[in-house]
Amino acid sequence: MHCPFCGANDTKVIDSRLVAEGEQVRRRRECLACGERFTTFETAELVLPRLIKQDGSRQPFDEEKLRAGMQRALEKRPVSVERLEAALAHIKHKLRATGEREVKSLVVGELVMGELQKLDEVAYIRFASVYRRFQDLNEFREEIDRLAREPGKE
């Protein structure tokens, strides 16, 4: 690390401590050239991939847009804010775990549908009907029948 006082490249770490509930590392450093001491803070940079839309355009991941879409599907459904936030965290974790700098928006849509299906099937159908652009009652019926046939359903 460069010394902020003299610009030298050689510094040594004198002390390291976890701060901010373990989310940050505070390091006390000393410049080997001028002897000045200074403090640095390190945090992990967890960047979410950019989205590739169906038309080929690219845009940054927007957590608020994702939250709003899921909240719209969950409107007037018995799902707590905590469960919604856990689902959002799970989606973001899966996106980061891809290791990709860009992902297709279809991937995000499928992750959202998977999480909504676990949270509330009515919300899942609401979201799927818009996301998959259901055109008539038969498409609703087919999706509901598919849900009913899944293992673990009575």
From Swiss-Prot:
Function of the protein: Negatively regulates transcription of bacterial ribonucleotide reductase nrd genes and operons by binding to NrdR-boxes.
Stretches assigned to coiled coil: none
Pfam families per the UniProt record, alphabetical: ATP-cone (PF03477), Zn_ribbon_NrdR (PF22811)
GO biological process: negative regulation of DNA-templated transcription
Ranges where the ATP-cone domain occurs: 49-139
Keywords: ATP-binding, DNA-binding, Metal-binding, Nucleotide-binding, Repressor, Transcription, Transcription regulation, Zinc, Zinc-finger
Protein name: Transcriptional repressor NrdR
InterPro entries per the UniProt record, alphabetical: ATP-cone_dom, NrdR-like_N, RNR_NrdR-like
Cofactor notes: Binds 1 zinc ion.
PROSITE patterns linked to this entry: ATP_CONE
Iron listed as a keyword: no
Zinc finger (unnamed) residue numbers: 3-34
Source species, domain of life: Bacteria
PANTHER family to which the protein is assigned, alphabetical: TRANSCRIPTIONAL REPRESSOR NRDR (PTHR30455:SF2)
Required cofactor names: Zn(2+)
Annotated family: Belongs to the NrdR family.
Annotated GO MF terms: ATP binding; DNA binding; zinc ion binding
